[in-house]
Amino acid sequence: SDLPISHVVITHSHPDHFFGTEAFLSESPSIVGHEKLNRSLLSNFNFYKELQSNNIENEVLKNAKLIKANIKIKTENILKVDLGDRIVEIKAWKSGHTDNDLSVYDLKTKTFWSENIFVDRIPSIRASILGWKRNLDEIQKMDIDLIVPGHGSVVKKDVALTPILAYFTRLISQVR
C-alpha cells in the first residue's frame, strides 16, 4: 500500500504472529500488544528463534530482533484507532488461546480479525479451554459479518463459530 503504516498489531506471542514485525519499523509505527505480550515475548523469544532457525535456513530469521509493544492494552480493554475512513477496535482478551490474545474489529465492514481465538480446524489446546470458550461465546454475541482467522479462510460468523463452540462444549463436558 502507498498509505503510511501507523500501527502494527502483534496479536499474540506465537512466532507465526510476531516474527516479521521488524519489516515495518522504517515507518515508525506504534507496536500494539496485550499488556501481557512483552513478558511472554521476553521469556520465549530466544527459544522460538532457535526453533525456527533450526527449521528454516534464513539469515533474516537468524538475525531477528525482539520487538516489544509500545502500546499495551489492558485485559478486557479496547483501543480505538481512527484510520480516517474507518475506526478499528483492538481488544485485549482474558486468557484463552494464550494469556495475551488481541483481536481487531472493523466497525465499518463488521469484519473481525480473530487471530487464533478462532481457527478453521481443531485448535491446539495449550491454554485455558474454559477461557477460550468464554471468549468465543463473547465473540458470538458481537455484531460481526466476517471473521478473518489466524489460520484459514475468511468465513461468515455463524459458519465459523458453530462447529468450534460445539467442539469445546463437548470436550469440556466429556473431560470433566
What are these model-derived regions, one by one?
Residues 61-63, 84-89:
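N-terminal-biased segments
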